[in-house]
Amino acid sequence: MVDSYDDAFDGEKSKTQIKRELHALVELGERLTTVKADTLARLPLTDELRKALAEACKHTAHGARKRHMSFVGKLMRDQDLDAIHAVLEQIDSSSRQYNERFHNLERWRDRLIDGNDEDLERFVNEYPDTDRQQLRSLIRHAQHEKARNKPPAAARKVFKYIRDLDELQRGLR
């Protein structure tokens, strides 16, 4: 005998699976409320969802916010989730690259201030547009500040100079 009960539910999702998917949509909606307006404009969203995301910031009471985010989750069902995830992943990737580059420049600054001429030569080889005289002067001021336990204003100038060189070399300026 064929069990018709099992055959009836083969293609359907369980109640738990549906709840998980709805919860994931609400979490994605929460994430979209934290995205900047220019990034939000790049996402393929309906006008109704854009309006609901803008209103989400106005709800501060826990219950009201939770209700509104459930509404946002409901609106998210009709969206192209793959396209939204792709844009958000691209943003996360560029953010990680920016942070990695930023930390690399901080390491260069610290090596130049704490280091010797070899570090300066390596830096000049990596960034050929460097004005050695200006960079040496900035490093010398930063070393004096560090020796006298003063606030690191000159170290910030070294970092700014290094960052400007990096942006120039990458064509960002």
Swiss-Prot record:
InterPro entries in alphabetical order: DarP, DarP_sf
A Pfam family this chain is assigned to: DarP
Coiled coil location: none
Keywords: Cytoplasm, Ribosome biogenesis, RNA-binding, rRNA-binding
Gene3D superfamilies linked to this entry: PSPTO4464-like domains (1.10.60.30)
Species whose genome carries this gene: Pseudomonas putida (strain W619)
GO molecular function: ribosome binding; rRNA binding
Protein name: Dual-action ribosomal maturation protein DarP
